[in-house]
């Protein structure tokens, strides 16, 4: 006689197969959970490493930008000492022009200023302008004229690449 399906399901072999299936299922679940945990940890690690990489990359890029700016500034101001050494020569030419209005000296001065301007040197306009403490140094005052204005320029000042190389020595109107 053949066992009924309910009897067949209760045979020791069937029971053992069912238990084995359940054990395997639990093992697979544990393996799956372990793999899931390792995957999650790997994603976290990748995320942390990516963040660290991006921070380091940004830091290197900022460092490069800073160094590029420093090199640019060094290039711009490399001639500063040389141009400062030329200022007394320009002062002497200006003094000679004041003493005798020699057109040849004026041309030489203008030519020299033209050459030096290619390296960033520019004279500061002082006479008739409003006093600016960043551009002008007061060496005297007068009451003749509009208050706060530069009346006379005693010594010309110069800028180098938008920075002041030497301030103009001026006489200012003060009432």
From Swiss-Prot:
Pfam families: GrpE. Keywords: Chaperone, Cytoplasm, Stress response. GO terms for cellular component: cytoplasm. This is Protein GrpE. HAMAP family: GrpE (MF_01151). One of its GO terms (biological process) is protein folding. It is found in: Cytoplasm. Its main location: cytoplasm. Belongs to the GrpE family. GO terms for molecular function: adenyl-nucleotide exchange factor activity; protein homodimerization activity; protein-folding chaperone binding; unfolded protein binding. PANTHER family: GRPE PROTEIN (PTHR21237), GRPE PROTEIN HOMOLOG, MITOCHONDRIAL (PTHR21237:SF23). Participates actively in the response to hyperosmotic and heat shock by preventing the aggregation of stress-denatured proteins, in association with DnaK and GrpE. It is the nucleotide exchange factor for DnaK and may function as a thermosensor. Unfolded proteins bind initially to DnaJ; upon interaction with the DnaJ-bound protein, DnaK hydrolyzes its bound ATP, resulting in the formation of a stable complex. GrpE releases ADP from DnaK; ATP binding to DnaK triggers the release of the substrate protein, thus completing the reaction cycle. Homodimer. The lineage of its organism: Archaea, Methanobacteriati, Thermoplasmatota, Thermoplasmata, Thermoplasmatales. It comes from the Archaea. It comes from Thermoplasma acidophilum (strain ATCC 25905 / DSM 1728 / JCM 9062 / NBRC 15155 / AMRC-C165).
């Amino acid at each position: 006689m053949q066992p009924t399906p309910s009897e067949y399901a209760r045979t020791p072999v069937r029971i053992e197969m069912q238990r084995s299936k359940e054990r395997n299922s639990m093992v697979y679940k544990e393996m799956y959970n372990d793999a899931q945990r390792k995957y999650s940890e790997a994603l976290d690690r990748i995320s942390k490493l990516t963040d660290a990489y991006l921070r380091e990359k940004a830091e290197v890029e900022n460092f490069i930008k800073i160094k590029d700016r420093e090199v640019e500034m060094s290039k711009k101001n490399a001639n500063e000492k040389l141009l400062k050494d030329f200022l007394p020569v320009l002062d002497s030419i200006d003094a000679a022009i004041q003493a005798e209005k020699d057109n040849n000296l004026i041309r030489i001065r203008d030519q020299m200023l033209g050459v030096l301007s290619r390296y960033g040197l520019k004279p500061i306009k002082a006479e008739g302008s409003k006093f600016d403490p960043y551009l002008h140094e007061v060496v005297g005052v007068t009451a003749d004229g509009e208050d706060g204005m530069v009346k006379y320029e005693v010594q010309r000042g110069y800028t180098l690449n938008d920075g002041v190389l030497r301030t103009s020595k001026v006489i200012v109107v003060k009432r």
